[in-house]
Amino acid sequence: AASPADRSVVGGGERAAEWLDSARVLIGNYFRMENPSFLEPAARESFVNARLPSGLAIRGIIDRVDRAPDGALRIVDYKTGKSPNPRFQEEALFQMRFYAAAVRLSRGVLPRRTQLIYLKDGRTLTYDPVPGDVAAIASELDSTWSAIEERLDSRRFEPRPSKLCDWCRFKELCPEFGGVAPDMDASGARALRTAKEPAGPS
């Protein structure tokens, strides 16, 4: 049965029962994929905080970090959804390259392997990073940040509707759905800009 804490999140009755059923599937798949008694992670829920050469801060939380006897690192992240269709794996590959770059920039070591474990369908997506990934990710993130800065300057943020809109907590404020976006707070914009600092001497 769901605990009081669980019920406060998922509700009671049928909703709680559905949530527990879905959780059982995920847990069952996990134990079919891995035997935790054989795992000795070097870290769990590991926070990484790094800066790109441009000075842009990047952060993330890695579910599991494994260290081989020779010191090589493996980055593992768990997903509760299904694995992506091969035609749509680019976003997943981006995440793995992002983690690899963040670890390389913050710890000086490029992970030998990154893995996304999809518990819903019991599949694992594996990618072995290469040194060029760090520069590629840095370039992509810098480009994204430049686009954000342009919109901060113009105070125009064009809606980009997609199927993910149903999950957005700000949907009711979005002009795309008949909402009225609030005025941009100047102090918030200034705070956002602090994500990038001038690069230090090399």
Question: What do the PLM-derived regions correspond to, one by one?
Answer:
Residues D21-V25, A42-E45, P53, L93-R97, ...:
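A short linear-motif detector with a strong N-terminal bias
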Residues P4-D6, I75, G81-S83, T144-L152:
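Short amphipathic alpha-helical segments and their helix-coil junctions
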Residues V10, E14, P84-R87, L105, ...:
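Short helix-to-loop capping/linker segments positioned immediately adjacent to catalytic or ligand/cofactor-binding
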Residues E18-V25, R59-G60, E91-F98, G132, ...:
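Generic recognition of stable, solvent-exposed alpha-helical segments in well-folded globular domains
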Residues A1-E45, R51:
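A non-catalytic, helix-rich entry segment at domain boundaries
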Residues D70, V103-S202:
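Metal-dependent nuclease catalytic regions and adjoining charged, substrate-binding loops involved
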Residues S46-I137:
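Mg2+/Mn2+-dependent nuclease catalytic core
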Residues V10, S22, L26-E34, Y78, ...:
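Broad hydrophobic/π-residue packing in well-ordered secondary structure
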